[in-house]
């Protein structure tokens, strides 16, 4: 009877300092949704399965999480949105590990629930202030790169596994020389028998430095420093710094604590930190269980990464357009207002934490440039992996096609044209004087990955009359 034990309080007045969480609760048949929601509140804060006398030794009314609102999810029969408030004192300052151990620690295996999903959180300013936030942030990154008013362009070296160091460096050089700002290691290239990390760093940085000399622009290659232990990660990152790299990357799978450590290292060493969300779909893709990717975006902004993969709107990986825009908003805005159709359930003030740059990658190509610029805006890294490396005339041509497509779209935008409607025409005009772009448009004109997303918003705007 969690509800009777004080974990259900419909009259609770939310404090500015409370951490708020929204769970999608699917109770087992016969379990009352309010009771199920109170159980989630209890099991993620102070309760255990029975009443214990040691409760009397604590200020237990203060430390109980309170479920304060339960709504049925539209168009479902057995799912409910449970709003839960946690007192800020339940959490250790500046520790994502502790936050997740509480909120997502034990409740997901709870028997009274068929499934449970963490949909959104509101982190109070007082709590956010205990986190460093992004090491560099989008403003400083633009100043370091000397690139303003347009998205950054990147590409991932393909094939992701099997290249030797020298050939890997060639790919980096050609992509950057063709006009990209960044090339990146893939998430699973660390230090394998076919190419050890030091060899890759040396050849890649040679490619970067030559491309910079040729183009006169600042460029970078995301050197993946992911490794088995924190000591090895630091060793690789230090070596990358000695070679003059401006950016390193880590995978989400190294864990929240390691990511926070790397973010602190990155700020101390004036390094941009790119986070690849490797492994996130294991818990973020299903609609009824796990957690929503936007929660990870929020945690990662607190942890302090500069780039995070946030979905593409038009590519090959999972992501509903509306929700992808929202994941991007969580990363970039200074204060996000509640927006139910986008799945943003709470207002969130980010205090003075810097902004993360969202990264769009996976199955995008230059023929979609107008849509990408429209949906994602300018503070984003557009990564064309196959869209660069897969160009018939070679990597440098693929890079040039992407850069020309982007620049033509930005010029049209600056001239005040409707670049979304005129997008295909703008690209065609630009392609008249750029062979590689023409080739790319001809090759990929019809490719798009049209599957319905498994993770879509539940609350949809419905048109009302007389407005």
UniProtKB/Swiss-Prot annotation:
Gene3D superfamilies: Ribulose bisphosphate carboxylase, large subunit, C-terminal domain (3.20.20.110), RuBisCO large subunit, N-terminal domain (3.30.70.150). One of its GO terms (cellular component) is chloroplast. The keyword Cell inner membrane does not apply. Mg(2+) binds at residues 184, 186-187. The modification N6-carboxylysine is found at residue 184. It comes from the Eukaryota. Its cofactor is Mg(2+). InterPro entries: RuBisCO (IPR033966), RuBisCo_large_chain_AS (IPR020878), RuBisCO_lsu_C (IPR000685), RuBisCO_lsu_C_sf (IPR036376), RuBisCO_lsu_fd_N (IPR017443), RuBisCO_lsu_N_sf (IPR036422), RuBisCO_lsuI (IPR020888). Its main location: plastid. PROSITE patterns: RUBISCO_LARGE (PS00157). Binds 1 Mg(2+) ion per subunit. It comes from Chondrus crispus (Carrageen Irish moss). Heterohexadecamer of 8 large chains and 8 small chains. RuBisCO catalyzes two reactions: the carboxylation of D-ribulose 1,5-bisphosphate, the primary event in carbon dioxide fixation, as well as the oxidative fragmentation of the pentose substrate in the photorespiration process. Both reactions occur simultaneously and in competition at the same active site. The gene is rbcL. Disulfide bonds: none annotated. The basic functional RuBisCO is composed of a large chain homodimer in a 'head-to-tail' conformation. In form I RuBisCO this homodimer is arranged in a barrel-like tetramer with the small subunits forming a tetrameric 'cap' on each end of the 'barrel'. The record marks 316 as: Transition state stabilizer. This is Ribulose bisphosphate carboxylase large chain. NCBIfam families: PRK04208.1 (NF003252). The active site is at 158 (proton acceptor), 276 (proton acceptor). One of its GO terms (biological process) is reductive pentose-phosphate cycle. Substrate binds at residues 106, 156, 160, 277, 309, 361. It is found in: Plastid, Chloroplast. It is an enzyme of class 4 (lyase). It catalyses: 2 (2R)-3-phosphoglycerate + 2 H(+) = D-ribulose 1,5-bisphosphate + CO2 + H2O; D-ribulose 1,5-bisphosphate + O2 = 2-phosphoglycolate + (2R)-3-phosphoglycerate + 2 H(+).
């Amino acid at each position: 009877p969690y509800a009777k034990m004080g974990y259900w309080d419909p009259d609770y007045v939310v404090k500015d300092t409370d951490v708020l969480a929204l769970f999608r609760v699917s109770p087992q048949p016969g379990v009352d949704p309010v009771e199920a929601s109170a159980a989630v509140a209890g099991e993620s804060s102070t309760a255990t399965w029975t009443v214990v006398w040691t409760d009397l030794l604590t200020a237990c009314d203060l430390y109980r999480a309170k479920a304060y609102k339960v709504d049925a999810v539209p168009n479902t029969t057995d799912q409910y949105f449970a709003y839960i408030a946690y007192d800020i004192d339940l959490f250790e300052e500046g520790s994502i590990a502790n936050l997740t151990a509480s909120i997502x620690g034990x409740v997901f295996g709870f028997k009274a629930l068929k499934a449970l999903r963490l949909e959104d959180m509101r982190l109070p300013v007082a709590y956010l202030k205990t986190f460093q936030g992004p090491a560099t942030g989008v403003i400083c990154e633009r100043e370091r790169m000397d690139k303003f008013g347009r998205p950054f362009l990147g590409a991932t070296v393909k094939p992701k596994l099997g290249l030797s160091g020298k050939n890997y460096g060639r790919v980096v050089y050609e992509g950057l020389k063709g006009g990209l700002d960044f090339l990146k290691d893939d998430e699973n290239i660390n230090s394998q028998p076919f190419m050890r990390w030091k060899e890759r760093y040396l050849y890649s940085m040679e490619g970067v430095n030559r491309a910079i000399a040729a183009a006169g622009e600042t460029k970078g290659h995301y050197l993946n420093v992911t490794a088995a232990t924190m000591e090895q990660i630091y060793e690789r990152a230090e070596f990358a710094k000695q070679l003059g790299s401006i950016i390193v990357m880590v995978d989400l799978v190294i864990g929240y604590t390691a990511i926070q450590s790397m973010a602190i290292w990155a700020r101390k060493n004036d390094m941009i930190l790119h986070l690849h969300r490797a492994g996130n779909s294991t818990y973020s893709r299903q609609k009824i269980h796990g957690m929503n990717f936007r929660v990870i975006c929020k945690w990662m902004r607190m942890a302090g990464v500069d780039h995070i993969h946030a979905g593409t709107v038009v590519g090959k990986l999972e992501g509903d357009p509306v929700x992808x825009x929202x994941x991007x908003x969580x990363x970039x805005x200074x204060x996000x207002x509640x927006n139910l159709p986008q799945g943003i359930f709470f207002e969130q003030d980010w205090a003075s934490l810097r902004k993360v740059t969202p990264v769009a990658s996976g199955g995008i190509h230059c023929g979609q440039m107008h849509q990408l610029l429209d949906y994602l805006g300018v503070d984003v890294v557009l990564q064309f992996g196959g869209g660069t490396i897969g160009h018939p005339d070679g990597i440098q041509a693929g890079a040039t096609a992407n850069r020309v497509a982007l620049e033509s779209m930005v010029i049209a935008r600056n001239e005040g044209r409707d670049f979304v409607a005129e997008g295909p025409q703008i690209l065609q005009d630009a392609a008249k004087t750029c062979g590689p772009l023409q080739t790319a448009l001809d090759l990929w004109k019809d490719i798009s990955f049209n599957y319905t997303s498994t993770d879509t918003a539940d609350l949809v705007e419905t048109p009302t009359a007389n407005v």
